[in-house]
């Protein structure tokens, strides 16, 4: 694993889950001061400067991070386990979305639906290929579930679209899932 990937994972840990690891404060919307992030990561023994950080942000294939307009602030665009307000606006999704998951979770999902677990939202994909990539990141055996978002909308479920095009919702009851 190259240094940018390792550093990117560490930045993800900091901005999505544990800013206290390097004693970093995020504002209520999940933004960190870019200069402070670089300084505190450097103090933790990792090599980073603005050029490296910018490369990680720009080249991350999942587009996990974004800068504000003048690049003085940075945040993760979704996937937080800590409470942040990403200022997401409600959006009408396509009629069908997909959820890729480990096969071992299937029975639980049939009984309880898809829960956000430790995150702020359930993550859904607009296409099967993306859902497959999500499902295979931790486990070999996976399943792709089809979500009837049109029916969910009729029952007043809300959907949001993150900056990196991940569809988000609070919960998917099993009655809206095609197994």
From Swiss-Prot:
Signal peptide per UniProt: none
Keyword annotations of the record: NAD, Transferase
EC number: 2.7.1.-
Superkingdom, natural source: Bacteria
A biological-process GO annotation: tRNA processing
Keyword rRNA processing tagged: no
Family the UniProt entry places it in: Belongs to the KptA/TPT1 family.
Function of the molecule: Removes the 2'-phosphate from RNA via an intermediate in which the phosphate is ADP-ribosylated by NAD followed by a presumed transesterification to release the RNA and generate ADP-ribose 1''-2''-cyclic phosphate (APPR>P). May function as an ADP-ribosylase.
Full protein name: Probable RNA 2'-phosphotransferase
Lineage: Bacteria, Fusobacteriati, Fusobacteriota, Fusobacteriia, Fusobacteriales
